[in-house]
A protein has these predicted regions:
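Catalytic core of pol beta-like nucleotidyltransferases
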Residues: 1-38, 46-52, 63-110
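Conserved histidines in hydrophobic membrane contexts and catalytic metal-binding motifs
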Residues: 41
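Short beta-strand->loop micro-motif that forms the acidic, two-metal-ion catalytic signature
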Residues: 57-59
Length: 110
C-alpha cells in the first residue's frame, strides 16, 4: 500500500459503484491513517447512478474528529477519485435530510 502522502488516481477506472467500492477498500490503510472509523457512500454513488460529473457523497465517522483529519481525508479522496467529494459527518446531518441519507447508506469501511 502506498504511504498516505502518495495518491494513485483511479478516476478513469470508475465506471460503477463496484469500482468505487473496490478503490476505497484498496486504500483502507490510508483511510485509517486519517482516523476513519467508518465510511459509507450515499446519494448517486450508493445507488449506482453516478454520471460523468457526479460528486461522491460520503458519510464518515472518525476515531478522533479533527479539522486536520477531515480536510486531509477530503483532499485525499478527491485526488484519489478524481471527483468532488461531499464529506459529511453524522453530527452534520440535518434532521430534514437524515432519513433519505440513511436509506441510501452503503458502508465501505466499518
Amino acid at each position: 500500500m502506498p504511504p498516505p502522502n502518495k495518491v494513485y488516481n483511479f478516476y478513469m477506472l470508475i465506471s460503477s459503484r463496484d469500482d468505487l467500492i473496490a478503490i476505497l477498500k484498496a486504500n483502507r490503510p490510508t483511510l485509517q491513517h486519517y482516523g476513519v472509523k467508518s465510511l459509507a457512500l450515499f446519494g448517486s454513488a450508493a445507488r449506482d447512478k453516478m454520471r460523468k460529473g457526479s460528486d461522491v457523497d460520503v458519510l464518515v465517522q472518525f476515531d478522533q474528529s479533527t479539522w486536520k483529519n477531515y480536510i486531509g481525508l477530503k483532499f485525499y479522496l478527491e485526488d484519489l477519485l478524481g471527483r468532488e467529494v461531499d464529506l459529511v459527518t453524522p453530527k452534520a446531518l440535518k434532521p430534514a435530510t437524515k432519513p433519505s441519507i440513511e436509506k441510501d447508506l452503503l458502508y465501505v469501511v466499518s
